[in-house]
Amino acid sequence: NNYGIEVDIKKDLSFIGLPNFSWSFNGALIKSRVNFSGTTLMENRPMQGQSPYLVNTGIFYKNEKLQLDAALLYNRIGKRIIGVGRSEGTTSGNEALRVPDSYEMPRDVLDLSVSKKFGTHWEVKANIRDILAQRVYYKEFVTATLNDGTTKKVEQITRSFKPGRNIGLSITYKL
């Protein structure tokens, strides 16, 4: 099952004294459920790869006279399953066979792009992708049994990497 709500807004900002600017927003709340029995740790879990929310927003600048365009874009997605766990064999009490679901954790992504035309033939474009360059974290959430028999919820990082910024520059000549 998959259901949700999405909002999409686009607004020219000239009403606040910014005649060449516009703003856009897209956001969604999604509820997804897949039902399994016996093969995963969670019999009723979110769909793999489906975020419970996403936010995209941006400020855009467009000046026809100067032939200049710019955009500052923000994106965030919610925690999502990237690897489905398994629980086969856990009925015998062998906890070593339990593999929890693996989640990609939310992070903020900010992009900037600028393009400028020179006459009718030349265009220069520059962009920076992932300005914030936040780390990507994959985590598992497990319940550990301590020596005294009590249980404790544990969050463990299974993978972490920093994708880094991407910077681009292009010069185009159109015939």
Predicted stretch roles:
Residues 52-56, 109, 166:
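Transmembrane beta-barrel architecture of outer membranes
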Residues 91-95:
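Charged, glycine/proline-rich intrinsically disordered loops and linkers
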Residues 7, 25, 59, 72, ...:
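Hydrophobic, well-ordered secondary-structure elements that form the walls
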